[in-house]
């Protein structure tokens, strides 16, 4: 059990950081079972001493969490409530009698038994004043920060890990400082402070916040409509469409919970890491290293994480050779995520793929003028004519749809060599992950699907059954209502997509949710979904550029969000959170985040000159411009013309075959040489996936990102492991948070007042300007 002292044998097992702990969720096979109950600051587990009446105030004031499980003996009368208000001790005794179980009654899977408790305390507070206030606070914070930075040159993203680390001290502070008296409101008795900050409150806050973590991706869809296709596209239309897409995704996740969440065989490995982290906060008593001043560490986090306008950095258009930067947003952003929280084996795979393609193959092909690419910029996400000018879509459109005759008279579409190669590598990555999953996880997936009947109700399923469930028809009503609202508003607002285009988008998500969800729940890997939606939209909605936006929103976006919500539901399942409370908190998080992010984007567009254009730096909207270019490639002109016969880019279709066969020799080599240490960490889908993100990510970010990963997760991990265990992940969270706060401060205090700080190294127009020019003159 996690609440007992660790033996010497258990301390030698792999650490969380070795298993892909962090936002990227990349874990090598057969190592997730090594998850230990290691404190995020690196401390091993210790037993927790129950607090007595004499020490209750010390428990509340202490930075060490009180164990909020069935081992706690603290009663409500001991924290300021009278015995007449309630007798928590009696409630907990009854709860223990109801939910105590034997060691043999546990999950059938060792990996789950290692990370998740097989007991529950139904009397533990979860839906409280504290969890509501902190949940709303972090939803607003994450929604604002992620959307604010998403359109900037180096976007950052606050995620679940940040919330887990930051909300804990706030929860402990509220448990210490809030009044503990009982209140009567409409016959309901409640208190602001039911006692020590509990693990269930912590989980609910994180689930509410995580509902908004990656919603900025879908806002790009409306950014393209607003900026390029329909300047009159209104805020209210965007709000309804985005809200309908998110609620459709959530209801789809809820309807699929019987197959993706409840079965014991659907493990969702990433949820195990989060569950283990929650338990380390609330079930252990870390002994901090007194030789390290935590206050000075905290100060340095914010001091170092200063935004790009103040630190030296490289230009953005080259390939990043010998690049150097002191800007933390280069090292940790929404494209690459924190190098400190990325396992070193994954960083090596990503960087090797980057070097092979961008530093070796791409320059050779470019300077040999492959496909006439030398007359275009080396790195660009824009689309061009054969004369190397920016592609003017108004020349090939009539009444909002594609005009084939005008296209023949104007120019075929051309892409930079780097941009076109990314599509070819994307084709290979899609096939390679399917083959990789079949080779490495195929038998496991088949076994887990068969076990959904025989191992449906493990101990976690039995314990969660004591709480009222969410009725399936609730989700069904939500799904139908959100889909109907999306169709009605989209057609009524003349977005340009026929009603059946919306139906097709919904059908894509409905058909793929179960098979893709099973793959992700078992293997912790999600097949590439974006290309599937792009291919279908280009085939069935060719000539309608706005069709790309709708299929990305409801087809790809809703499916990806539904899988994220399903993963969060599994985390709540493991942590024994009442399902109806999960529905309420996640629903509130979705609504708040949609309103904040959509309104913020429209405000930025109206108040920032030249937004999403090079002249508007740093508000260059890399991801938005990529979506715009993709809408031209896939829907306006169509894949048959761009990648079909007669096009210079037709050889890129060989990427499908290349990706199909590439993982096979690696698989057999790993079986042939099982003792080869480096070979067992080679993962072709990871090698290819790092390349697919360029663009929108600039190549200049990669070298410094890998350097910091090498320093922290190789050198420090190997030679200063005690420090690494204690401070590695909290340092990453502190740097990301400090960056977000400092950037907002600079925008409000400096940029909004017309103040610019210019010195050598931070002027983007003087950083290798030739890198943005073509090698050959057209």
Q: Where do the protein language model's features map onto the residues?
A:
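Alpha-helical multipass membrane-protein architecture
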Residues: 2-778
């Amino acid at each position: 059990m996690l609440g007992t002292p660790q033996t010497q044998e258990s301390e030698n097992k792999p650490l969380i950081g070795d298993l892909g702990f962090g936002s990227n969720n990349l874990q090598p096979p057969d190592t997730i079972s090594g998850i230990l109950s290691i404190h995020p600051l690196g401390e091993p587990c210790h037993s927790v001493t129950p607090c007595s009446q004499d020490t209750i105030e010390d428990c509340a004031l202490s930075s060490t969490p009180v164990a909020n499980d069935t081992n706690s003996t603290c009663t409500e009368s001991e924290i300021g409530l009278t015995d007449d208000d309630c007798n928590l001790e009696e409630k907990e005794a009854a709860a223990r009698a109801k939910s105590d179980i034997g060691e043999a009654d546990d999950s059938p899977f060792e990996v789950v038994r290692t990370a998740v408790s097989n007991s529950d305390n139904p009397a533990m507070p979860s839906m409280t004043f504290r969890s509501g206030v902190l949940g709303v606070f972090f939803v607003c914070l994450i929604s604002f920060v992620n959307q604010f930075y998403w359109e900037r040159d180096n976007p950052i993203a606050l995620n679940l890990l940040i919330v887990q680390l930051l909300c804990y001290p706030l929860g402990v502070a509220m448990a210490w400082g809030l009044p503990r008296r009982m209140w009567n409101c409409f016959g309901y008795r409640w208190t602001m402070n039911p006692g020590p900050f509990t693990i269930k409150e912590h989980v609910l806050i994180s689930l509410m916040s995580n509902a908004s973590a990656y919603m900025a991706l879908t806002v790009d869809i409306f950014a393209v409509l607003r900026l390029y296709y329909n300047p009159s596209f209104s805020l209210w239309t965007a709000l309804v469409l985005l809200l309908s897409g998110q609620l459709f995704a959530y209801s789809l996740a809820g309807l699929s919970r019987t197959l993706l969440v409840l079965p014991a065989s659907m493990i969702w490995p990433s949820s195990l890491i989060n569950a283990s982290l929650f338990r380390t906060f609330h079930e252990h008593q870390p002994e901090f290293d007194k030789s390290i001043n935590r206050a000075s560490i905290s100060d340095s986090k914010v001091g170092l994480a200063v935004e790009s306008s103040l630190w030296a950095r490289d230009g953005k258009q080259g390939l990043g050779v010998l690049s150097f930067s002191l800007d933390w947003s280069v090292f940790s952003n929404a494209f690459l995520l924190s190098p400190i929280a990325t396992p070193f084996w994954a960083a090596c795979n990503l960087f090797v793929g980057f070097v092979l393609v961008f530093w070796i193959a791409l320059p050779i092909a470019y300077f040999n003028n492959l496909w006439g690419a030398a007359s275009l910029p080396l790195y660009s996400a824009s689309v061009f004519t054969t004369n190397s000018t920016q592609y003017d879509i108004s020349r090939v459109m009539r009444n909002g749809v594609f005009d084939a005759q005008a296209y023949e008279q104007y120019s075929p579409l051309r892409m930079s060599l780097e941009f076109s190669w990314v599509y070819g590598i994307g084709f290979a990555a899609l096939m390679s992950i399917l083959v990789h999953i079949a080779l490495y996880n195929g038998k496991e997936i088949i076994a887990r699907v068969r076990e959904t009947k025989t191992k449906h109700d493990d101990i976690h399923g039995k314990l969660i059954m004591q709480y009222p469930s969410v009725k399936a028809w609730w989700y069904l009503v939500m799904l139908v209502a959100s889909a109907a609202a999306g169709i009605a508003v989209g057609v009524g607002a003349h977005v340009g997509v026929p009603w059946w285009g919306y139906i097709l988008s919904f059908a894509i998500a409905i058909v793929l949710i179960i098979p893709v969800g099973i793959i992700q729940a078992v293997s912790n890997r999600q097949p590439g979904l974006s290309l599937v939606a792009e291919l279908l939209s280009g085939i069935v909605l060719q000539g309608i550029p706005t069709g790309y936006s709708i299929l990305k929103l409801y087809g790809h976006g809703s499916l990806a969000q539904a899988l994220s919500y399903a993963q969060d539901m599994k985390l709540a399942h493991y942590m024994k959170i009442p399902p109806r409370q999960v529905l309420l908190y996640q629903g509130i998080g979705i609504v708040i985040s949609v309103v904040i992010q959509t309104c913020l984007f429209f405000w930025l567009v109206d108040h920032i000159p030249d937004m999403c254009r090079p002249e508007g730096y740093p508000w260059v909207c890399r991801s938005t411009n990529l979506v715009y270019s993709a809408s031209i490639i896939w829907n306006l002109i169509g894949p048959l013309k761009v990648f079909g016969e007669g096009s210079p880019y037709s050889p890129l279709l060989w990427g499908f075959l290349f990706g199909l066969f590439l993982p096979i020799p690696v698989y057999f080599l790993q079986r042939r040489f099982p003792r080869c240490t480096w070979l067992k960490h080679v993962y072709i889908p990871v090698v290819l996936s790092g390349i697919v993100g360029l663009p929108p990510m600039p190549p200049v970010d990669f070298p410094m990102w890998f350097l910091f990963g090498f320093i922290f997760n190789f050198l420090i991990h190997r030679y200063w492991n005690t420090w690494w265990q204690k401070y590695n992940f909290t340092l990453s969270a502190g740097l990301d948070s400090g960056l977000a706060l400092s950037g907002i401060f600079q925008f409000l205090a400096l940029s909004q007042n017309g103040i610019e700080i210019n010195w050598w190294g931070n002027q983007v127009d003087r950083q290798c300007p030739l890198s943005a020019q073509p090698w050959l003159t057209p």
